[in-house]
């Protein structure tokens, strides 16, 4: 992660929350325990975030004990009394943020001045579909002893969904074929009316170029580890009439924006949709969503990637502006130029006609996990007027991406953000 400034108190709190656990409000759509049942020395508010359970796994999150008589060094997770493991070791497998956090405390902030981040999540795997399980969590102390059990949290895995392979509808992962129509057909066919047990669209095995896609309620979109969803660089693939208004202002109306690469939007978007307009949407997988917004390399001929402190590659994008987008942009360039050709002033074209990676509006119960998100022409993930949102284990690689915020929550409630790695700014 890049260290370019000393964080303010609010920013430091945000960093801690995003790396560990950021809690929402009541009515958060999670399976949670009864805090009154948990001893003060036990972990509190154990919960399973909304939609985090699939047919074979689920995620547990919790808060620290209300009273700590001893130093807590870890947490132990139990299923029906059987010890599953420790949170810290589990995080090594499921949190892209943890190696960087460990490195920070071990090598950069070894003097102990900074408040340590307490990681409080655990991913449970090897479960059976459509089965209820009961879990408890204990704090582990420096001497190896454990706290009393938390209150019990019960959760049920999902039924095994029907899987629609994107290739079934003719999608080709060759990196050049335009797959917008094929992928949208797969999405449109993935409905509970067709598949009452649930449905998932799977994109796997290649680079799938596409324009704007539109999701609907009660579905999962999975991008496998061997797949990339690559945004088309053709502005026509993001038709303005299918776009959205960022705000519903009437006194000072905002210009309409083109749709993002992935969208949850009403067809006649007017700048707001109440949570519940759409419901129960999951975007998951170990694959990549690439907006194809900007050229690689800080300057012409520069390195497309750098190696960070953990030995991982970080893509390098071209910092730019309205005057330089023609030289630095890909989709950003083509969309801006197309708007200027329509007679729109260049600054306005640059500010309002670039597509983001995701615009997710009016969703009640939204879960994103595992994906690598990079190179939008405009913003990253935007969750607008939504409720019960979980972002788990995402990798955001949008540094110097010209307005490429990592995540935006607009007029939304009950957000949990944990295990995310952010290289943004």
Describe the role of every protein-language-model region.
Residues 21-24:
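C-terminal motif of bacterial Sec signal peptides marking the signal peptidase cleavage site
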Residues 2-12:
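Bacterial N-terminal signal peptides that target proteins for export
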Residues 26-425:
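Extracellular/periplasmic carbohydrate-active domains that bind, remodel
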């Amino acid at each position: 992660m890049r260290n370019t400034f000393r964080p303010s108190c609010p920013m430091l709190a945000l960093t801690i929350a995003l790396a560990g656990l950021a809690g929402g409000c009541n009515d958060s759509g999670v399976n949670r325990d009864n805090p009154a049942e948990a001893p003060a020395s036990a972990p509190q508010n154990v919960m399973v975030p909304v939609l985090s359970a699939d047919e074979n796994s689920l995620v547990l999150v919790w808060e620290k004990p209300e009273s700590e008589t001893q130093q807590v060094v870890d947490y132990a997770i139990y299923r029906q009394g059987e010890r599953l493991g420790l949170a810290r070791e589990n995080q090594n497998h499921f949190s892209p943020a943890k190696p960087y956090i460990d490195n920070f405390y071990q090598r950069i902030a070894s003097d102990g001045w900074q408040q340590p981040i307490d990681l409080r999540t655990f991913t449970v795997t090897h479960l059976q579909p459509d089965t209820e399980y009961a879990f408890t969590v204990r704090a582990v102390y420096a001497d190896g002893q454990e706290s009393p059990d938390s209150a019990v949290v019960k959760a049920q895995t999902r039924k095994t969904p029907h899987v629609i392979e994107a290739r079934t509808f003719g999608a080709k992962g060759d990196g050049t074929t335009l797959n917008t129509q094929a992928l949208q057909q797969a999405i449109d066919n993935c409905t509970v009316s067709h598949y009452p047990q649930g449905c998932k669209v799977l994109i796997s095995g290649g680079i799938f170029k596409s324009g704007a896609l539109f999701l609907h309620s009660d579905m999962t979109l999975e991008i496998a580890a061997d797949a990339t969803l690559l945004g088309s660089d053709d502005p026509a693939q993001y038709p303005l009439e299918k776009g959205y208004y960022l705000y519903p202002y009437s006194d000072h109306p905002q210009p309409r924006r083109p749709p993002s690469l992935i969208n949850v939007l009403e067809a006649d978007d007017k700048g707001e949709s109440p949570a519940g307009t759409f419901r129960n949407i999951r975007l998951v997988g170990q694959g990549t969503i690439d907006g194809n917004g900007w050229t690689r390399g800080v300057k012409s001929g520069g390195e497309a990637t750098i190696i960070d402190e953990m030995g991982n590659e970080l893509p390098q994008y071209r910092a730019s502006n309205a005057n330089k987008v023609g030289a630095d942009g890909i989709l950003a360039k083509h969309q801006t130029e197309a708007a200027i050709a329509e007679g729109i002033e260049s600054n306005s074209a640059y500010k309002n006609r670039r597509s983001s990676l995701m615009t997710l509006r009016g969703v009640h119960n939204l879960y994103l996990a595992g994906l690598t998100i990079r190179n939008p022409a405009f913003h990253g993930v935007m969750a607008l007027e939504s409720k019960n949102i979980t972002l788990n284990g995402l990798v955001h690689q949008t540094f110097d991406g010209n307005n490429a915020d990592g995540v935006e929550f607009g007029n939304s409630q009950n957000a949990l953000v944990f295990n995310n790695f952010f290289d943004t700014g």
